[in-house]
Amino acid sequence: MDHIRNFSIIAHIDHGKSTLADRIIQICGGLSDREMESQVLDSMDLERERGITIKAQTAALTYKARDGQVYNLNMIDTPGHVDFSYEVSRSLSACEGALLVVDASQGVEAQTVANCYTAIELGVDVIPVLNKIDLPAANPENAIAEIEDVIGIDATDATRCSAKTGLGVEDVLEALVAKVPPPKGDPEAPLQALIIDSWFDNYVGVVMLVRIVNGTLRPKDKIRMMATGAQYPVEHIGVFTPKSKNLESLSAGQVGFIIAGIKELAAAKVGDTVTLVNRPAAEPLPGFKEVKPQVFAGLYPVEANQYDALRDSLEKLKLNDASLMYEPEVSQALGFGFRCGFLGLLHMEIVQERLEREFDMDLITTAPTVVYEVLQRDGTTIMVENPAKMPEPSKIEEVREPIVTVNLYMPQDYVGSVITLCTQKRGTQINMQYHGRQVQLTYEIPMGEVVLDFFDRLKSISRGYASMDYEFKEYRAADVVKVDMLINGDKVDALSVIVHRSQSQYRGREVASKMRELIPRQMYDVAIQATIGANIIARENIKALRKNVLAKCYGGDISRKKKLLEKQKAGKKRMKQVGSVEIPQEAFLAILRVEDK
């Protein structure tokens, strides 16, 4: 066991984490040169294309150190994005050490810091590594100062390397072997294994990636999940060297996979503890929590007959993504669809993209909403994730909205515009620190404001230099109202939004005027109204198309003309009673885009 090292790599997006992983695999001979391709561990096309890591992956490698000893290195690749922070904390808790990769030309960024703090809280040893030192813009001294300043770990002897050219990667491995402690654990104790990740394979069912903390596991053992209590016989166990390789046993300190013929992913929850049925552990490993979706949106097929196909696609995605929630919902305007829950905005985009790309779906997405806590007059509290479920204003005692703590990092030139943005979004400033040229701002902002377009606007006002991460803090009472859109007195449910009262008038006017442009003129007048409860806050009229009924009258008596006009008016009135206004699909899409502005 003294020769096992479990480590993961922490880095901000694009700081070269996956490339470094590739080099390490190559040096340790995990794959032949022929099988080597860039970003070996990012197995999803979308991961490669966006250059982000979504699922955790592992590789068990052997490394012959300079002192002649052979070490078993278990590398656990972690996602870097804030939406997947729970997966990160699980990956990190399976390690004893973490390589903190910092781009020598860019310095420390927000998500690096967020994940690094998670690592330090879990008691993982952090080893700083400066990557991309082959770039002409690299400034290692500056980066070292930032690491010490912002994160507060000693970085004077940080290893310098360039993952692209392979320079200095062996020094990184030497530092790993020297500084990361070997795993603690007792191979004889009752089995405790932490599920780091799980995914669905078409041939063998659910594959669980585990770190054995105590005990030993062999094929044919019966295992039990401690969170759900489900039991399964083990079929295969082994390790990934990125390719899978079956073994006869996995014992304390090792990281490997278990295949046990599990049919659905919900049974193998990330962070759960696996133990043996006939010799169970006394208690599960700490830190398990159910992941709750934070952002909700409605997904509707453009063609109504694709509803079943959409349901199948969501089921298939759910096999590989336990944090995706969905339930069917019906909208009068958009027909049948699903209300889906996501961890955050990136997660939502990825799910949408995978549906469109891997399953060929055409989707309409309603504006994302967050979960509000509503205290009703009768004393009950309900959680509202869909504007349509919001009770009438007369029944509401108070509404509480989720508040998130946002950490922002940016060069000091952009501080002014970022502060303005945060204030527009009803943020309150908590803290502001200068670290050399970088500034760290901490704000508390309502989550509903963050999910709409905060990230895009932050990037555009800071020319892409600002980075952010956020975490949920608490529910807080707020003056939020539901704005409904009426067309000729009928509610259009898909366009209801929940906004802060201060923005409700502007929002109502904006949507009403947009609808006026987009709804084609009818044979009768159409009134578009925005309402809060029974109060109308904005109105637009679309005038009727009308025939010139006086054309055949040439001169003649005024009473004759009046009679014809009255007759036309009565006809229009009758039409208005029976007619219903069809809203074209383009109008919906355009209105949902207004909300992104």
Swiss-Prot record:
Recorded family membership: Belongs to the TRAFAC class translation factor GTPase superfamily. Classic translation factor GTPase family. LepA subfamily.
GO molecular function, one term: translation elongation factor activity
Subcellular compartments: Cell inner membrane
GO cellular component terms, A-Z: plasma membrane
Name of the protein this chain belongs to: Elongation factor 4
Alphabetical UniProt keywords: Cell inner membrane, Cell membrane, GTP-binding, Hydrolase, Membrane, Nucleotide-binding, Protein biosynthesis
Gene Ontology annotations of biological process type: positive regulation of translation
EC number(s) per entry: 3.6.5.n1
Reactions catalysed, as given in the entry: GTP + H2O = GDP + phosphate + H(+)
Membrane topology category: Peripheral membrane protein
Purpose: Required for accurate and efficient protein synthesis under certain stress conditions. May act as a fidelity factor of the translation reaction, by catalyzing a one-codon backward translocation of tRNAs on improperly translocated ribosomes. Back-translocation proceeds from a post-translocation (POST) complex to a pre-translocation (PRE) complex, thus giving elongation factor G a second chance to translocate the tRNAs correctly. Binds to ribosomes in a GTP-dependent manner.
Alphabetical list of CDD domains matching this protein: EF4_II, EF4_III, LepA, lepA_C
Binding residue positions for GTP: 14-19, 131-134
Gene3D superfamilies (alphabetical): 3.30.70.240, Elongation factor 4, C-terminal domain, Elongation Factor G (Translational Gtpase), domain 3, P-loop containing nucleotide triphosphate hydrolases, Translation factors
Keyword Repressor among record annotations: no
Domain tr-type G, residue spans: 2-184
